[in-house]
Amino acid sequence: MGEEANDDKKPTTKFELERETELRFEVEASQSVQLELLAGMAEIFGTELTRNKKFTFDAGAKVAVFTWHGCSLQLSGRTEVAYVSKDTPMLLYLNTHTALEQMRRQAEKEEERGPRVMVVGPTDVGKSTVCRLLLNYAVRLGRRPTYVELDVGQGSVSIPGTMGALYIERPADVEEGFSIQAPLVYHFGSTTPGTNIKLYNKITSRLADVFNQRCEVNRRASVSGCVINTCGWVKGSGYQALVHAASAFEVDVVVVLDQERLYNELKRDLPHFVRTVLLPKSGGVVERSKDFRRECRDERIREYFYGFRGCFYPHAFNVKFSDVKIYKVGAPTIPDSCLPLGMSQEDNQLKLVPVTPGRDMVHHLLSVSTAEGTEENLSETSVAGFIVVTSVDLEHQVFTVLSPAPRPLPKNFLLIMDIRFMDLK
């Protein structure tokens, strides 16, 4: 490892990595860092690095560059931390991928379906990273796996507050992640499943149905299987939601990260044919504060409207109150004694409640449903995209929105989220 200064006053450090080691670094707030592979081969979460190409990572990025055979790397810019580690679970993760690939080959031979894998564990154990790794390794072998995102707090397939699926056709971009050109997305409306667990489980089942339908008509998708990312809520209703997801998707393999108790509970409660594997988390996994999570969510939403590093220009336009119908999924809970005869609180959770446009709608995100009419079940219909309300004019009965596409809105049924986005940058 050697340090030198370059022309533009950015500190530059070279790292020589031995085989099966990784360089871990975190980017300082309001800084950016450039990484370059000078010699050898290396990868980031399963995506191979191109030699002599500079990759840029923005403030808050937490990165691990792994090499199987040794390499030479250069970092330019201010990092909060940068060190090389020999202690990595990558070999175990690779073994998991190899076992899944054997299952795919067997599925091909025997005209069956490929492995459906669910990655579970508490918060901050690296679930999304393991998903990305398994998907990248599969797609590098010519597979076309489906990525299923059940983590409403993160929304890596779309934005936070949604659940969705993405057909993976190429490895994730080192800087931008997976290409999200045509995801299948459903509105959940909040960043925690506990706000409406009945809706959460219903959308999980819906995603499983749609995935099954795709597998019936697309042999390659069926053989490639899916990788399911889940929430970090693993107790009580959160645990029940994991069991429900495993059942809905008929998973074959459950990868449990870093929690023996959860591993034993799932081993006990899931059918005996489900292979449950306990894997360690990487030493590079960092605990994220509430503030950091909130910033990441905001950044994810900002990226939806403005593109990666601001490459898009969103549209602002007025929408008449009379042109749209806005709903919220789930009525407020009321005492059981006040419910109509034969109705339970659970029925209430799936109820569509009309929303009258008002000033309290400002900054809220709205999902634009693909539904043609309310006779379709709005909560189980996918969404075309999202808009954010920037102002409400009660006098003229219009509200102004920020939208990634120009007017008019493709459909007139909107679902309101609890999530707000303040466009301050």
Curated annotation (Swiss-Prot):
InterPro entries: Clp1 (IPR028606), Clp1/Grc3 (IPR045116), Clp1_C (IPR010655), Clp1_C_sf (IPR038238), Clp1_N (IPR032324), Clp1_N_sf (IPR038239), CLP1_P (IPR032319), P-loop_NTPase (IPR027417)
Keyword Nucleotide-binding: yes
PANTHER family: CLEAVAGE/POLYADENYLATION FACTOR IA SUBUNIT CLP1P, POLYRIBONUCLEOTIDE 5'-HYDROXYL-KINASE CLP1
Cofactor: Mg(2+); Mn(2+); Ni(2+)
Keyword 4Fe-4S: no
Protein name (database record): Polyribonucleotide 5'-hydroxyl-kinase Clp1
An annotated Gene Ontology molecular function: ATP-dependent polyribonucleotide 5'-hydroxyl-kinase activity
Family: Belongs to the Clp1 family. Clp1 subfamily.
Residues that coordinate or bind ATP: E22, K62, D124, V125, G126, K127, S128, T129
Compartments where located: Nucleus
Alphabetic keyword roster: ATP-binding, Kinase, Magnesium, Manganese, mRNA processing, Nickel, Nucleotide-binding, Nucleus, Transferase, tRNA processing
Organism: Bos taurus
Enzyme Commission no: 2.7.1.78
Subunit text: Component of the tRNA splicing endonuclease complex, composed of CLP1, TSEN2, TSEN15, TSEN34 and TSEN54. Component of pre-mRNA cleavage complex II (CF-II). Also associates with numerous components of the pre-mRNA cleavage complex I (CF-I/CFIm), including NUDT21, CPSF2, CPSF3, CPSF6 and CPSF7. Interacts with CSTF2 and SYMPK.
Function: Polynucleotide kinase that can phosphorylate the 5'-hydroxyl groups of double-stranded RNA (dsRNA), single-stranded RNA (ssRNA), double-stranded DNA (dsDNA) and double-stranded DNA:RNA hybrids. dsRNA is phosphorylated more efficiently than dsDNA, and the RNA component of a DNA:RNA hybrid is phosphorylated more efficiently than the DNA component. Plays a key role in both tRNA splicing and mRNA 3'-end formation.
GO biological process, one term: global gene silencing by mRNA cleavage
Gene Ontology CC annotation, any one: tRNA-intron endonuclease complex
Catalysed reactions, semicolon-separated: a 5'-end dephospho-2'-deoxyribonucleoside-DNA + ATP = a 5'-end 5'-phospho-2'-deoxyribonucleoside-DNA + ADP + H(+); a 5'-end dephospho-ribonucleoside-RNA + ATP = a 5'-end 5'-phospho-ribonucleoside-RNA + ADP + H(+)
